[in-house]
Design a protein with these regions (language model features):
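Class I S-adenosyl-L-methionine-dependent methyltransferase catalytic core
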Residues: 1-169
Length: 169
């Protein structure tokens, strides 16, 4: 599947640890892919109310077979809902990760937490979109977990990435 790079289990486990998910929390994985992150959430946080979104029909079928609660196929069309935790590995190409992070943050409940893999581009590019994102991020309560070079090599890409953890107060 073009542009699909599943989250390695070790990274998904770190993301779920960073998310601090408790029983009863509403949790969303909005770029669910094959369910790499959602599988870890379900395994480590069985009391969470977990929902997933995925646009690819083949991957939707896989998520359904795995028993995940598929609530939509378009990340940006799910309005009027808020989640306590959003854990995601969105596409990086053309700064799509910036769009996904901003949308996800807007759909967090007060006191919620977003944990997202992001590419390096938003943190060093000089174009307006990247600069605006950095300025926005500086106004948030956030932390960064750097990932080793080659962290996604097993998934077929050498892109450097990091985990960004943002709390909504």
């Amino acid at each position: 599947i073009p542009g699909f790079f599943p989250t390695p289990t070790s990274i998904a486990e770190e993301m779920v640890r960073q998310a601090g998910i408790s029983t009863g929390m509403r949790v969303l994985e909005p770029s669910a892919g094959s369910g790499s992150i959602a599988d870890v959430i379900r395994e480590q946080c069985p009391g969470a109310d977990l929902s997933v979104i995925e646009y690819n029909l083949t991957l939707q079928d896989l998520l359904k077979v795995k028993g995940h609660n598929l609530v939509g196929d378009d990340f940006f069309s799910v309005d009027g809902q808020q989640w306590d935790r959003i854990v995601q590995n969105p596409p990086f190409e053309n700064l799509q990760d910036v769009d996904h992070v901003r949308w996800a943050f807007d759909h967090l409940a007060d006191g919620g937490r977003l944990v997202s893999v992001m590419g390096e581009s938003p943190f060093f590019r000089s174009d307006a979109k990247a600069a605006e994102f950095r300025a926005w991020l500086d106004d948030q309560v956030y932390d960064v977990v750097d990932l080793e070079a080659g962290a996604f090599a097993a998934s077929g890409t050498g892109v450097k990435a990091r985990i960004v953890v943002i709390d909504k107060e």
